[in-house]
From Swiss-Prot:
Keywords: NADP, Nucleotide-binding, Oxidoreductase
Coiled coil: none
Binding site for NADP(+): 48-51, 188-191, 211-214, 276-277, 366-367
Pathway of action: Secondary metabolite biosynthesis
Subunit-level organization: Monomer.
Reaction(s) this enzyme catalyzes, per UniProt: (2S,4S)-4-hydroxy-4-methylglutamate + 8 malonyl-CoA + 3 S-adenosyl-L-methionine + ATP + 8 NADPH + 11 H(+) = (2S)-3-[(2S)-3,5-dioxo-4-[(2E,4R,6R,8E,10E,12E)-4,6,12-trimethyltetradeca-2,8,10,12-tetraenoyl]pyrrolidin-2-yl]-2-hydroxy-2-methylpropanoate + AMP + 3 S-adenosyl-L-homocysteine + 8 CO2 + diphosphate + 8 NADP(+) + 8 CoA + 6 H2O
Name of the protein in question: Trans-enoyl reductase cghC
CDD domains assigned to the protein according to its UniProt record, in alphabetical order: enoyl_reductase_like
Taxonomic lineage of the native organism: Eukaryota, Fungi, Dikarya, Ascomycota, Pezizomycotina
MF GO annotations: nucleotide binding; oxidoreductase activity, acting on NAD(P)H
PANTHER family recorded: HYPOTHETICAL OXIDOREDUCTASE (EUROFUNG), ZINC-TYPE ALCOHOL DEHYDROGENASE-LIKE PROTEIN C2E1P3.01
Family: Belongs to the zinc-containing alcohol dehydrogenase family.
Amino acid sequence: MAISATTQSALVGGSQDDIILSTSAPIPQRLEDDQVAVAVKAIALNPVDTKMLGDFHTPGAVLGCEFSGVITSAGPVATSEWGLREGDRVSGAIMGMNPLRPQIGAFAQHTVAPAHVVLKVREDWDFAQGAGMGNAWYTSGWALFHTMGLPAGPQLEPLHTLVPPPPGNAGKLPSTNKPITVLVSGGSSSTGTTAVQLLKLAGYHVIATCSARNFDLARQYGADEVFDHSSPTCAADIRERTRNALRFALDCITTPETTRLCYAALGRSGGRYVSLDPFSEAVAATRGVVRPDWVLGPELVGEDIAWPEPHGRKGNPKARVFCEAWTRTLQRLVDQGLVKTHPQLVRDTGLKGALGGLDDIRAKKVSGQKLVYLL
């Protein structure tokens, strides 16, 4: 399915530290052996997309990390190792606003993605649902089953067999017949509902925090217990409920307030705190028995990241190995109907509408839903 055009419409970095709709962005022409080219049919917005300004901003670079569409061309490795072929309906999680690959991003009519971050979309899913199987699923898996060091368990094959958690990350897990409890702060966010589902599949007991209006949402995705994050006694209530023994907390929001809540909820002997953004060092310093860390989803691609510190880093081969196993795991979960996407607010206003969607996210007008735009 050759693409004769050389330019396209895309959301790109503007010259005034802003995001603009360009109608003359170049279509990526070079396809590497392990990549696929995709005609984009739907895109999903994330809070990170609103942060690609200032030092993260590259004029002309395409924005966006989540998409779904139809493969127009596949490299030989993408076909031989991943079974991806022209005409396949797929979703992907890539790094937008990438100064090293400025022509590649999700918010465009055409994009390119490495095969190891691409999933085939189920036949009974539309493109909007497909666009929801991206960033959150990769980031939460990396955070829980690598950085936090939780064993994935046999329910999450082949990850469980291929990539065991690094030794020492979680410390010695308690030998008990009761499920280990994990706190998910921001349990009604996109990454939150994803993390809750994965933890339940892996056999954990999940406590979620969110606003009271989203309690039912968190429960629908599997949370065993839900607490109101705005309650002044939230952390104390969780600590009492867990008998002062909670050891694991995933912070899907990552503000000083949510870090403080997680730290206060963790038990007397401390434990592991993992966030999705750099956390407050001042808060982290308040409890030496808690080991904090944070994750950067694009690291899973395995390539150098040229964003400003502390986000910039060399390519991580171990992250790519994890990602390859995790993609095979996610594909099985999708195919078997074991996971569902976050609730979606679908709009058919295309890339132009997505500009307004970024403003809605900045203004916190969207809660408990993922914004998806059809192209």
